[in-house]
Amino acid sequence: MISLKGISKTFKTKNGAVQAVDNVNLEIEAGQIFGIIGYSGAGKSTLIRLLNLLEKPTEGSVKIDGKALSSLTPSKLRAARQEIGMIFQHFNLLWSRTVRQNISFPLEVAGVPAAQRKKRVEELIELVGLHGRGDSYPSQLSGGQKQRVGIARALANNPKVLLCDEATSALDPKTTDSILDLLLDINEKLNLTIVLITHEMHVIQKICHQVAVMENGKIVEQGPVIDVFRKPKEQMTKEFVKQLAQTGEEEQSLWHLLDEKSDGTIVSLTFVGNPAEEQLVTELIRRFPIDISILQGNISKLQQGSYGKLYLRLLGATNEIEAALAYIRGKEIDVEVIEHDR
């Protein structure tokens, strides 16, 4: 559905050239939710604007549904853009228009007849969960409701692709989850290809099938979300995964426990796919003459399975502990022995 080949974007400034996007290659399949994550200044926003040629690439080609956008005439590019919806961090609504009028706007621009527009607008109001708010103005809506209007407007012309530029960054956690649930529902109902950029690993974890990690204008790591969680290669990716696996408070709590329980072997177990922590601990107790304490654990649900982290303290003879660790590794569970002489 989406193909980027050797995409680069350089901006000229009074202080010299700035390479915002550097030789990016991506293939995004139809119906996928593809997440691009990175810190501020990584080049994410520039990259997503290159997908519909709001920014023109300095080098490389962008293909959407087989069409090379850079080679299209202005009129054909406008037609191609109608198949690419976009939502933004700060909603970009028309404040003097009602919900219905905001959603109707792209249909008016496209020359859709009034009766057809009215029918489509009502369908979209129901789809995004805004029943009863059609005559409200943006100033009368919550942040989440404003973003729902933005989503409905982006879907007005039945696009094949939806681009999301930090669409949940201005929302509180509960509202963020409701918008992510809506995007997931739309993806499943319409088989819509969604490309989103974010700096929040929670967004990737909750709805994405594939992820690309961006740093200094480059894609430094990419793949199925579950694989990137299982074996993050780059240091920045490891930092993002750690954010989800363990909050700052949880990390402090863990180190406090380690200070209290300084004896024994402390191990971190990473489960990916279908975690079965309780079953594993029961098996270890049954098979090996060692004492086991669970220090901390959590599970995050991914689109292709689950990701879990479990911290154990093992007490017993060295050879028995080594045998237990070998048994765990034999289950294809990642094991890390944690040094805790702090």
UniProtKB/Swiss-Prot annotation:
Superkingdom is Bacteria
Give the E.C. number(s): 7.4.2.11
Residues of the ABC transporter domain: 2-241
- Which InterPro entries does the annotation name? AAA+_ATPase, ABC_transporter-like_ATP-bd, ABC_transporter-like_CS, ACT-like_dom_sf, MetN_ABC, MetN_ABC_transporter-like, NIL_domain, P-loop_NTPase
Mind naming one GO cellular-component term on file for this protein?
plasma membrane
Report the catalytic activity.
Answer: L-methionine(out) + ATP + H2O = L-methionine(in) + ADP + phosphate + H(+); D-methionine(out) + ATP + H2O = D-methionine(in) + ADP + phosphate + H(+)
Q: For ATP, which residues are the binding ones?
A: 38-45
- Give the first-level EC class, as a single word: translocase
One example of the protein's molecular function in GO is:
ATP binding
State its role.
Part of the ABC transporter complex MetNIQ involved in methionine import. Responsible for energy coupling to the transport system.
Quaternary structure (record): The complex is composed of two ATP-binding proteins (MetN), two transmembrane proteins (MetI) and a solute-binding protein (MetQ).
What is the name of the protein in this document?
A: Methionine import ATP-binding protein MetN 3
